[in-house]
Amino acid sequence: MQAPKHHRRLFAVLATLNTATAVIAGCSSGSNLSSGPLPDATTWVKQATDITKNVTSAHLVLSVNGKITGLPVKTLTGDLTTHPNTVASGNATITLDGADLNANFVVVDGELYATLTPSKWSDFGKASDIYDVASILNPDAGLANVLANFTGAKTEGRDSINGQSAVRISGNVSADAVNKIAPPFNATQPMPATVWIQETGDHQLAQIRIDNKSSGNSVQMTLSNWDEPVQVTKPQVS
């Protein structure tokens, strides 16, 4: 059945982050990390930008710290692929009328499905009418664009992200790039951000946090399973 319009508006926000994942993934420093010289920040951000432009699937963990107007998502978990077709699935905790709501979601065949009631799937119509879930992997509007517009890069140290050593780099992201990937921020000037880039392999983007210093809010996304297959089953609508 088709979901009510007020629920569609709610999931317009949920779908903007359809590319995300489950438990809040943090980072930790440890003595097992390399103690060698830190790499050049600008070079590594450029390498991560080039790699991210070609990523077609990923597992993401998203967490929102604080309250952001128009963004009732607290945590979101899921997998996304844009090749050969765009599909996504996951789970989110959202705040509705002051209460936390846990919902599963699926995007398949261009349709957005979700469970606002446990085990009861509803069809929210065309995902593209609510939000283009593929945008986070869009090289012109997603994470690659954020990295391409990352300025003032400075290496800060090393942390462990999902058990992998990553170099922590601080800088700023242009307002336009922020608003493309996180419209509720309504950025009017560059925003402080921190990226964690894997120290081994292809130097994949392992984590990013965008901070709104004026409000004290932030959005953090942690990535893994780059370019691994994603399988999604179309749910049975109640």
Swiss-Prot record:
Residues 1-26 form the signal peptide. It is found in: Cell inner membrane; Secreted, Cell wall; Secreted. A lipid is attached at residue 27 (N-palmitoyl cysteine). The keyword Glycoprotein applies. One of its GO terms (cellular component) is plasma membrane. The lineage of its organism: Bacteria, Bacillati, Actinomycetota, Actinomycetes, Mycobacteriales. This is Lipoarabinomannan carrier protein LprG. It is a lipid-anchor. GO terms for molecular function: lipid binding. Pfam families: LppX_LprAFG. GO terms for biological process: lipid transport. A lipid is attached at residue 27 (S-diacylglycerol cysteine). Keywords: Cell inner membrane, Cell membrane, Cell wall, Glycoprotein, Lipid transport, Lipid-binding, Lipoprotein, Membrane, Palmitate, Secreted, Signal, Transport. Coiled coil: none annotated. Its main location: membrane. Helps membrane protein ML0556 (P55) transport triacylglycerides (TAG) across the inner cell membrane into the periplasm and probably ultimately to the outer membrane. Binds TAG in its hydrophobic cavity and transfers it between lipid bilayers. TAG probably regulates lipid metabolism and growth regulation and plays a structural role in the outer membrane. Binds di- and triacylated phosphatidyl-myo-inositol mannosides (PIMs), and glycolipid lipoglycan modulins lipoarabinomannan (LAM) and lipomannan (LM), facilitating their recognition by TLR2. Constitutes a host TLR2 agonist (toll-like receptor) able to stimulate proliferation of CD4+ T-cells derived from a human leprosy patient following protein processing/presentation by MHC class II molecules in peripheral blood mononuclear cells. Modified by Lgt on Cys-27 with an S-linked diacylglyceral, signal peptide is removed by LspA, Cys-27 is further modifed with a fatty acid on its amino group by Lnt yielding a triacylated protein. Probably glycosylated, which is required for T-cell activation. Forms a U-shaped beta-half-barrel with a small hydrophobic cavity able to hold a triacylated lipid or triacylglyceride. A flexible lid region may move to accommodate different TAG molecules. Bacterial LAM blocks host cell phagosome-lysosome fusion and is one way in which Mycobacteria evade the host immune system. Triacylglycerides accumulate in lipid droplets in the cytoplasm of M.leprae, and are used as an energy source during starvation. Disulfide bonds: none annotated. It comes from Mycobacterium leprae (strain TN). Belongs to the LppX/LprAFG lipoprotein family. Gene3D superfamilies: 2.50.20.20.
